[in-house]
Amino acid sequence: MKGATMNNNKKYNLNFFSMDDSFFTRLTRIRPNDILHIFKFISAWPIACIYRRLRRHLWLLCEYETEARDNAFYLFSYLREKQPQIDAVYAISHRGKDFYKVKSLGEVVEYGSWKHWLYYIAAEINISSQKGGKPNAAVCYALEVSGIWKNKRAFLQHGVIKDDLPFLHYKKTRMRLFSCAAKPEYEFVRDTFGYPDNYVRYLGLCRFDILHTVQADPNLILVAPTWRNYLYFIKGTPGNQSQEFLSSDYYQKWDSLINSPQFLELIHRYGKRVIFCPHRNMQSYSSLFICSDPAVSILPWEQADITDLIHQATMLITDYSSIFMDFAYMKRPILYYQF
């Protein structure tokens, strides 16, 4: 299930996403490491106003800082291959292992750089699969949601919504386009999230286009639990956080599954392999999961390409991660392990 977004290396300033705050209240929540981005924004603004005349129809796309594996990447790939006349640029850090994959397709800009700000301000439209996909989420949020700075932003999403998510309501985003993948989802978001007419569109997920062509490994099972808000925001020292996580029902249930003698016996009987890959928001605890059986691999998110795993796995075991939609789309079996 979809929840608060997070950078691949650090948590966003999620205090920004409270309801009905004034512009000045949001400003007080800007952290010291956000201050540099305020100066980047101020210095890039006048130049961007001129630069916009040179590139009137610039489309800027991005996802996470170091990744290109979701809907924004698949849209960028399509644009470069099928619609090269569109002036599309992708923002990604050179430190990401997907950097050269994107660079081979077209122009890239360093994520969070001054040039990223220049392009973000000058762009005709900013497109992302993440709500926080921008040079600096805190600064942009304060300016955009307060109405100080008006721009066009398209939200491609990275899953399918099944619940009311207040942080995605229009008054919390001011996004101009909100793409949905399923008819019931589209109707729910349109009627519940408060967007003006025609801002919510039934367009599908870009990454679904490739699902028609991928071939599964018949022996690979993906175990992919989603995250829990109460575990993501555990306070205290790392040691205290680990102890609280170890005592949680979440850890104990998933640990008991991957170490279950009955489960492992079935895996070996049918010659299967299991990859256990918790949601990125649980990755700080992934090292606490241990299984000595060679048929089970514990895969930290930073080592995983979740898109490849979705393509390769012949079966999914999850609680309610929205990637079950991908498996349903491919008509592959899904086993729900819920507690």
Where are these regions (language model features)?
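Membrane-proximal basic amphipathic "stem/tether" segments
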Residues: 1-58, 63-65
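Active-site and donor-binding regions of nucleotide-sugar-utilizing enzymes
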Residues: 57-211
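Conserved catalytic-core segment of nucleotide-activated headgroup transferases in glycan assembly
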Residues: 70-76, 80, 206-288
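Nucleotide-activated donor-binding/catalytic signature segment of Leloir-type glycosyltransferases, i.e.
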Residues: 287-302
